[in-house]
């Protein structure tokens, strides 16, 4: 039976690279040449090549969907809106899971606070507010900013609930939030007068 000497014991065993890892010992105990080891490595790399991109469109889309879903959940919890799944058969679990996912993904901005109606999308809410209430904008419930387009509103809500959410300064009298103390000072001067605000801001 021939004797074998392990040249690189720390390398992972692979059938394509066996020639580079194990060498038959002979009387002269010659080691393999560099070219045989490189050829074995090339064979190994050819076998393990992947056609999938490391960061594909589907990965980005999945990540964005999960991020939007988390933002919406936080919005629901903050506003105290409770969603229920009515009319779902308990026997059909697939339908129930799909319905739960759809209900969870419904954005909280579809709720009109003026007439307490719920709409299918934020664009429908914007149309409703423009026609019925003559207020063609969506208002942020945290900082009271107004937005005439839903894409602007959704981008703004990421500053409150997204992964890079900003910390805001809050007015003690009306509970409005501002991104810095200068905005809060301006709010004090305009809304509450310039009375004792220096003590509160310090």
UniProtKB/Swiss-Prot annotation:
Keywords for the protein's UniProt record, in alphabetical order: DNA-binding, Metal-binding, Nucleus, Repeat, Zinc, Zinc-finger
PROSITE patterns in alphabetical order: ZINC_FINGER_C2H2_1 (PS00028), ZINC_FINGER_C2H2_2 (PS50157)
Disordered as annotated region, ranges: 43-63
Localization of this protein: Nucleus
GO terms for MF: DNA binding; zinc ion binding
Keyword set includes Hydrolase: no
C2H2-type ZnF: 110-133, 138-160, 169-192
Gene3D superfamilies referenced in this protein's UniProt entry, alphabetically: Classic Zinc Finger (3.30.160.60)
InterPro entries, per the entry: Ikaros_C2H2-ZF, Znf_C2H2_sf, Znf_C2H2_type
The UniProt record lists the keyword Membrane: no
Gene Ontology CC: nucleus
The protein, known as: Putative zinc finger protein ZK686.5
């Amino acid at each position: 039976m021939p004797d074998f000497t392990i040249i690189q014991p720390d390398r992972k065993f692979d059938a394509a690279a066996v020639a580079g890892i194990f060498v038959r010992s002979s009387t002269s105990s010659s080691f393999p040449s560099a070219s045989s080891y490189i050829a074995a490595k090339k064979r190994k790399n050819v076998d393990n090549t992947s056609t999938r991109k490391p960061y594909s469109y589907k990965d980005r889309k999945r990540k964005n969907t999960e991020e939007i879903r988390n933002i919406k959940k936080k919005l629901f919890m903050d506003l105290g809106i409770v969603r229920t799944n009515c009319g779902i058969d308990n026997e059909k679990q697939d339908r129930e899971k799909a319905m739960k996912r759809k209900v969870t993904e419904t954005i909280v901005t579809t709720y009109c606070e003026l007439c307490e109606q719920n709409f299918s999308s934020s664009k429908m809410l914007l149309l409703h507010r423009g026609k019925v209430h003559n207020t063609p904008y969506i208002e942020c419930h945290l900082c009271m900013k107004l937005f005439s387009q839903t894409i602007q509103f959704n981008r703004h809500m990421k500053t409150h609930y997204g992964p890079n959410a900003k910390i805001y300064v809050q007015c003690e009298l009306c509970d409005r939030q501002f991104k810095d103390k200068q905005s809060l000072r301006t709010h004090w001067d305009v809304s509450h007068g310039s009375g004792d605000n220096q003590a509160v801001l310090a």
